[in-house]
Amino acid sequence: MAHTVSLVAPRRQTRPVQVGSVQVGGDAPISVQSMTNTDTRDLPATLAQIHAIAQAGADLVRVSCPDMASAEAVKALVAQAPVPLIADIHFDHRLALKALACGIHCLRINPGNIGSTARVQEVVAAARERCVPIRIGVNAGSLEKQLLEKYGEPCAEAMVESALHHIHILEDLNYPEIKVSLKASDVGMTVMAYRQLASKVNYPLHLGITEAGGMRSGSVKSAIGLGLLLAEGIGDTLRVSLSADPVEEIKVGFDILKSLGLRSLGVNIIACPTCARQEFKVIDVVAELERRLAHIREPVTLSIIGCVVNGPGEAKETMVGVVGGQGENLLYQHGQTIGKRGDAELVETVVEQVEAIAQQMRAAKEKAEAE
């Protein structure tokens, strides 16, 4: 197996916070999260989506609490959720207090928009009592009026100034359990804002491109923006914001981390884009394998190459490999040929091989943890 060349800078050192059972920042793995888009008051629908997001590999899930009934629903959600939950709160400090009382693991608020200093103090006191961190979420689309007047339009400098203002509110109350996000729909503005803030504070940073768009365009924008920052060692948790099923956000988030060698979840399929030389239907096989192997969490590498031009070389670098060969496709395992399979048997054989390797990896991990 060849060694992967890393372009990623050393991770920025941040002050860790604890979101339920998940550490964010410090030396913890970069966590991946998403947000439900159901009516939070609809417990069956919201719980079903939380479980689906968690099943996809999410470390954290955020729920919106726009009213008191939604905040009250947090109690039942926390009791049945398989991962820690974050409450998204705006304007009304009573919603934050209710979510805290119901056991939420983290708050996403802007201290400056939930009322007077006394109200902020009340929320911080309740968060401190429960050791619940607060994410300051700055968004280019909702910057303070005075900042828009000062800078003329949303910009990285205005976002950083807003973040520092909210950070200072919590610091003045001696509450350092903070993480911060600075999101814009513009990739360049977002990257510049995170770079600037990263040079000024050591709080964990939640990365994201807000309102990134649909599945294709949003994934590309997020991969570029988040990828740039992660490669510079900036970022402790991330959300890929898509106008799509939240489960897809988790998949794309892990794909970004996987591409940078920062964190792997599931099977990494390397496949050719196909041409006239393909000896089997690569696109159909890859689509079927993605579906059949979606349940696997172990970082198994798999190459699916349609011909002998690049196939053998790729197969030698992956745990399982397939090289097209006129109806008799070569199979590889750990760089060695192990036989041939016809097109009809190909998918089933590869699934069996990958599942067997994943099981070996699980067993080895369990043994190591038990020792």
From Swiss-Prot:
The keyword 4Fe-4S applies. One of its GO terms (biological process) is terpenoid biosynthetic process. Pathway: Isoprenoid biosynthesis; isopentenyl diphosphate biosynthesis via DXP pathway; isopentenyl diphosphate from 1-deoxy-D-xylulose 5-phosphate: step 5/6. Binds 1 [4Fe-4S] cluster. The keyword GTP-binding does not apply. [4Fe-4S] cluster binds at residues 272, 275, 307, 314. Its cofactor is [4Fe-4S] cluster. Pfam families: GcpE (PF04551). It comes from the Bacteria. Its EC number is 1.17.7.3. It catalyses: (2E)-4-hydroxy-3-methylbut-2-enyl diphosphate + oxidized [flavodoxin] + H2O + 2 H(+) = 2-C-methyl-D-erythritol 2,4-cyclic diphosphate + reduced [flavodoxin]. Keywords: 4Fe-4S, Iron, Iron-sulfur, Isoprene biosynthesis, Metal-binding, Oxidoreductase. Gene3D superfamilies: Dihydropteroate synthase-like, Sulfite Reductase Hemoprotein, domain 1. InterPro entries: Dihydropteroate_synth-like_sf (IPR011005), IspG_bac (IPR016425), IspG_bac-typ (IPR004588), NO2/SO3_Rdtase_4Fe4S_sf (IPR045854). GO terms for molecular function: 4 iron, 4 sulfur cluster binding; 4-hydroxy-3-methylbut-2-en-1-yl diphosphate synthase activity (ferredoxin); 4-hydroxy-3-methylbut-2-enyl-diphosphate synthase activity (flavodoxin); iron ion binding. Belongs to the IspG family. NCBIfam families: ispG_gcpE, PRK00366.1. Converts 2C-methyl-D-erythritol 2,4-cyclodiphosphate (ME-2,4cPP) into 1-hydroxy-2-methyl-2-(E)-butenyl 4-diphosphate. This is 4-hydroxy-3-methylbut-2-en-1-yl diphosphate synthase (flavodoxin). The lineage of its organism: Bacteria, Pseudomonadati, Pseudomonadota, Alphaproteobacteria, Magnetococcales.
